[in-house]
């Protein structure tokens, strides 16, 4: 997704393409927010018989903006579901704006689940960390959950794993 203007949010990343013969395409990254804008959401990974596509990362927030959410990983049938995208970091001076949540991992009924994306970090001083993404449902093994993002130095909670 494209970067936002001064007060605008970043654009949403495009979805990864699906395939019935291989691995799904990766989702596009979300654009970075303008000075007061939030980061855009990452696009979801595409469906693939032999592996789900990875979700796109969320864009970073502008100086005062929140981070964008990571895209979810694509679903797979035979192999592993796609990993969720990482959440974008919040802007340095964002008051109460959190890092973006990590995307959830893709599922696979005959393979392993994809890992959840890590949460974005809160603003350098004041923001809370974003939550880590949920691991995907799998037949062989479930996907690992993503780690939560770090909080700002002065105020803010760490993100949940």
Indicate residue ranges for each PLM-predicted region.
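Long, compositionally biased tandem-repeat segments
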Residues: 1-161
């Amino acid at each position: 997704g494209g970067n936002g203007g001064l007060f605008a949010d970043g654009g949403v990343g495009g979805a990864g393409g699906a395939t019935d013969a291989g691995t799904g395409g990766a989702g596009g990254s979300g654009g970075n927010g303008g000075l007061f804008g939030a980061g855009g959401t990452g696009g979801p990974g595409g469906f693939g018989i032999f592996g789900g596509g990875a979700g796109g990362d969320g864009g970073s927030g502008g100086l005062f903006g929140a981070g964008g959410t990571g895209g979810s990983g694509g679903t797979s049938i035979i192999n592993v579901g796609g990993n969720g995208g990482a959440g974008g970091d919040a802007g340095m001076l964002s008051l109460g704006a959190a890092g973006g949540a990590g995307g959830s991992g893709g599922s696979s009924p005959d393979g392993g689940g994809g890992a959840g994306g890590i949460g974005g970090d809160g603003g350098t001083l004041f923001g809370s960390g974003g939550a880590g993404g949920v691991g995907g449902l799998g037949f062989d093994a479930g996907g690992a959950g993503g780690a939560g993002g770090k909080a700002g130095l002065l105020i803010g909670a760490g993100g949940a794993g």
